[in-house]
Every structure is written in structure tokens, then in C-alpha cells.
Design a protein with these regions (language model features):
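Mobile cap/lid helix-loop segments that gate and shape the active-site cleft of serine hydrolases
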Residues: 1-43
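Solvent-exposed loop/turn segments at secondary-structure junctions
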Residues: 1-4, 59-61, 89-93
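Short glycine-/acidic-enriched loop or helix-start segments at secondary-structure transitions
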Residues: 6, 64-65, 96
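A generic structural signal for short
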Residues: 17, 59-61, 107
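Conserved serine/cysteine hydrolase catalytic core
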Residues: 39-49, 66
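Short beta-strand/loop motif that positions the catalytic acidic residue
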Residues: 47-48, 53-56, 60
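C-terminal catalytic histidine-bearing segment of alpha/beta-hydrolase fold enzymes
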Residues: 53-55, 69, 73-126
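Conserved alpha/beta-hydrolase "acid-adjacent" motif
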Residues: 61-70
Length: 126
């Protein structure tokens, strides 16, 4: 994370890694690799993971489509079950309630289609 992400400014906070200031990805890559899902996918012959639904928004610059597809390819390489869905012409935070002026999202227009995809996934797998 960097200061380029406006949400740090809006929260009056500073960018940090998921493990705080002491352990950052540059100085401790082995720790981040150990907890990163993409590096810890077992082959289906070793352990079958539950089906996963991966969603992305084509205008998302925080969690870009490319990153989600990398994870999808890693699951595919290990023969794990997943479904992938792209929310076309949408930005990050399309599931936020109400309207998000910064992202240009409106829950009624953007969230409902995503929830339908999620509910269909749950109906199929639960």
C-alpha cells in the first residue's frame, strides 16, 4: 500500500502492511509468502479446497482483474474448483451500501447483480 490510495488519507491513517509496521513485505517476504493464499494452494490430490467464487470489477485499480485472474490460474493449476465473475465497467467497492461518490458506485445498480451471482453460487454449493 502507498499514499496513492486515497482511503488512507480519508481515514487519517498511514499505509501499512497487514502485519503492521514491524513486518513489511520488503524486509520479510517469507512471512508474507507464508500467509498469502496464492502461494499456499494445495494440489487437489493432496487436499480439495471448498469451491471458491472469485469476483472482480473491470475498472478496479485496488484489486485489479489481472490480480484476481492470477489467483484463478493458480487454483486451476492445482485443479481446485472455482467460478470467476467480472462486474463490467464497475469500480472497487461495488458492494458498499448506498452510493459511493469517490468510486462512482450505487448499490442498487451495482451491488444487486453481484449479490445475485453470489446467491446462485451459494445455491449451487451449499
Amino acid at each position: 500500500e502507498t499514499y496513492k490510495n486515497i482511503f488512507w488519507w480519508l481515514a487519517f491513517s498511514k499505509p501499512r502492511g497487514v502485519l503492521g509496521k514491524k513486518f513489511n513485505p520488503v524486509d520479510h517476504p517469507e512471512i508474507y509468502k507464508a500467509i498469502s493464499p496464492i502461494y499456499n494452494i494445495p494440489d487437489v490430490s493432496q487436499r480439495k479446497l471448498p469451491p471458491q467464487l472469485l469476483t472482480s470489477a473491470t475498472k478496479d485499480r485496488i484489486s485489479p482483474v489481472k490480480m484476481i485472474k492470477q489467483y484463478a490460474n493458480a487454483l486451476k493449476d492445482k485443479n481446485q474448483e472455482f467460478e470467476y465473475w467480472e462486474h463490467l465497467n464497475r469500480n472497487h467497492a461495488y458492494l458498499d451500501s448506498g452510493k459511493t461518490i469517490y468510486a462512482g458506485n450505487d448499490f442498487k445498480k451495482d451491488g444487486i447483480p453481484a449479490l445475485k451471482v453470489m446467491m446462485n453460487f451459494f445455491d449451487k454449493h451449499l
